[in-house]
Amino acid sequence: KPPSGTLPNQMNVSGFLGNGLVNTYFRGDRTTGTLTSPEFTIQRKRIAFLIGGGRHPGKTCIELHVDGRVVRTATGQNNELLQWRGWDVAEFGERTARIRIVDQVTGGWGHINIDHIGQTDQRQVGTPPPPALDPWTQYVQVLLGSNEFMFVR
C-alpha cells in the first residue's frame, strides 16, 4: 500500500492528490531503490506529474525511458510540497515508454515524492491539466526549458 502522506520523522508532505503517493522517505533518507512502471504507449504531447522531495539530479528523480534510454528527467526542489511538473514528449508519440522513480541518495533530502502521473495535450499558459489530474484547481504553466514545464497553483 502506498504511503498516505507524511511518514514518521518526515517534515509535512503536502500537495499530493487522493489517498496515497510514492514517498521514498520510508525508514528515513537512508533507504534507496527504484520503482519502474509497466510499459505504456505515449499517446499525448505531454506527461505531467506532481513532484517533491530531494534535489539530486539523476539520483532522486523521475525518469522517462524510451527505447531503453533516459530521455527526460525531473527532480524535487528540497521541499515536501509536491508541485506540478512535466515534459514535452510529442517527439516520442506512439512509442513505448516506462516511468522510473529513482532514490539513490542516503543523506539529506535523500528521497523523492511523486503523485498523479498522467498524459495530457495541454500546454498553454492558464490551461489546467486534464480533469483526471485535478479539475478543481486553476493552474498557470511556467516553461522551465524546451522540454519541461511546471504548473503553479
Predicted regions, residues:
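Extracellular glycan-recognition surfaces and repeat-rich motifs
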Residues: K1-L21
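Short beta-strands within extracellular/lumenal beta-sheet-rich domains
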Residues: N19-R44, H56-K59, L82-W87
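Beta-strand cores of secreted/periplasmic/IMS beta-sandwich domains, seen most often
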Residues: E39-I51, I99
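Active-site-proximal structural scaffolding
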Residues: I42, P57, E80, F92, ...
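Beta-strand acidic-aromatic groove motif in beta-rich domains, primarily in extracellular
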Residues: I47-A48, G52, P57-L64, G110-I114
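Extracellular carbohydrate recognition and processing domains
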Residues: L64-I112, D121-T127
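Substrate/cofactor-recognition hotspot
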Residues: R123-R153
